[in-house]
Amino acid sequence: MSDIITLAIESSCDETAASVLKNGREVLSNIISTQIETHKKFGGVVPEVASRKHVENIDIVVQEALDKANIGFNDIDHIAVTYGPGLVGALLVGLSYAKALAYTLNIPLVGVNHIEGHLSANYIEHKDLKPPFITLIVSGGHTHLVEVKDYGKYEILGKTRDDASGEAFDKISRAMNLGYPGGPIIDNLAKNGNKHAIEFPRAYLEEDSYDFSFSGLKSSVLNYLNGKRMKNEEIVVEDVAASFQEAVVEVLSTKALKAVKDKGYNIITLSGGVASNSGLRAKITELAKDNGITVKYPPLILCTDNAAMIGCAGYYNFINGKTHDMSLNAVPNLKINQ
């Protein structure tokens, strides 16, 4: 069987990315143009600005991915592209480019769910990994606990009922005037703080639920900060960061490992931007070790948005006959099992 070459495109939020893969798991190139510096002054991603930046960057990024992989357009077997969830304008830039290219080259177009892309990042790093297993997907827009039954076959066990975990990090960072994105900033501060200094609440919800909730925790931290400011008392940002982070990662880890044990698996994977959080990696690894469970996660470059993960997911869709025609449209609220 000859090698299958995938060109993948990702533009769901504020990264313009393109990647070339061989047989789904071998990354030949992975180019990412980030807009963090552009959006930092706004304290978050501005959708219109993000879309314009994608338009400026996408052709350059795709060409660089092809050049680095040392392949031409005629070597590509199919194109994988994110079509949701995400910012609709941003999604349309990547999707329109991919559709035009697939049409011109007369090769298959494969639409990829961004969340499915995140969990697929682990296939790239861990060559021996295959379904079934449990995965925890945690990012600025998503917090999902998913049973991966097979390639492309999933059951959502739990998800956030309000804020995503990464969204909570950004909001607390903004409340302390620390900057954007909040996740890495709080993670770094937490390393020098006392995680037991402030007892913030943990929301475990119903006993049999795998769902998450971070709005109560967020409100508790905001109330703590406001109370300190009203009394003109010192706020030790390192302790706030460490205590807040501990409250988040404790719930994420506990629920994830409960799902692994309840379902009878011995492997859990992490993915998404928050999977790069050192506190989460340490906590879930510690709890997993005590229960004989193996934890796998991608390198940092594959945790945040990238096209390699989209290409991996797209490859498995492609070999399973899941392709799309030119009517494929952006779906900003796409669910993982749609």
From Swiss-Prot:
Its cofactor is Fe(2+). Coiled coil: none annotated. GO terms for biological process: tRNA threonylcarbamoyladenosine modification. Binds 1 Fe(2+) ion per subunit. It holds the Pfam family TsaD. Substrate binds at residues 137-141, 170, 183, 187, 277. It is found in: Cytoplasm. Fe cation binds at residues 114, 118, 305. This is tRNA N6-adenosine threonylcarbamoyltransferase.
